[in-house]
Amino acid sequence: MKVFILALLALAATTAIAQLETTCSQGFGQSQQQQQPGQRQLLEQMKPCVAFLQQKCSPLRMPFLQTQVEQLSSCQIVQYQCCQQLAQIPERTRCHAIHIVVEAIIQQQSQQQWQEPQQQAQHKSMRMLLENLSLMCNIYVPVQCQQQQQLGQQQQQQLQEQLTPCTTFLQQQCSPVTVPFPQIPVDQPTSCQNVQYQCCRQLSQIPEQFRCQAIHNVAEAIRQQQPQQQWQGMYQPQQPAQLESIRMSLQALRSMCSIYIPVQCPAPTTYNIPLVATYTGGAC
């Protein structure tokens, strides 16, 4: 009898998975074509979470099991799969996975269902998603996930302007100051040292929960300004190059400013990019 019940449960799970694949295949087709390989893999892994959060599952009817076992629904099976997949994703990359889930849900929802601008709707979805997944799966999701998403376009632009000294310093676009009186027995400051000081001071004034976003903006500004040939170890497509520059910026700013930057800052570990790339630009 136990073998019979287990076989029926396995059949129910198989049916639920088949329903999930049928439901998701159409919605994910277009978005996956635009995703990078690492993102596509994460999106595939998080399909059960997308299906569950959209409530695209319905109870399975198994009347002959009423007296034997508790009725399992396809929603319960998909919920279990979602939590299982999320638990297998390293903590430092869960933010990235959740971002992908939110984008997939918003792309599949008709625009008429949102009564507010899409960006605000995305922030609201992120908050709801974090609450649901944390409670539903009893799993740790970094707090920075939500806080990073609450920055609007204007705030991001302000952050980028605020950290212009960091962009300048990391690009090594500063040169020693010519001092007419070198005989003075004092270490002569250079423009690089001045810019470094300004960078660290500005970064320390940014709240901890927003430093990740600020560094992302700095790295993106550097990547856009530098010719592709100046980066060794950066190849197409663009996304790995951006992630590598974020990682380089993190390393430089952590050691240079002696300031706290959340460990979860980059989600780029999914792409297996080396920790260090060689920069061939000028030096101070």
UniProtKB/Swiss-Prot annotation:
Contains disulfide bonds. The keyword Disulfide bond applies. InterPro entries: Bifun_inhib/LTP/seed_sf, Bifunc_inhib/LTP/seed_store, Glia_glutenin. Residues 1-18 form the signal peptide. It comes from the Eukaryota. The keyword Signal applies. One of its GO terms (molecular function) is nutrient reservoir activity. SMART domains: AAI. Keywords: Disulfide bond, Seed storage protein, Signal, Storage protein. Seed storage protein. Might be integrated via inter-chain disulfide bonds within the glutenin polymer. Belongs to the prolamin family. This is Avenin-like b9.
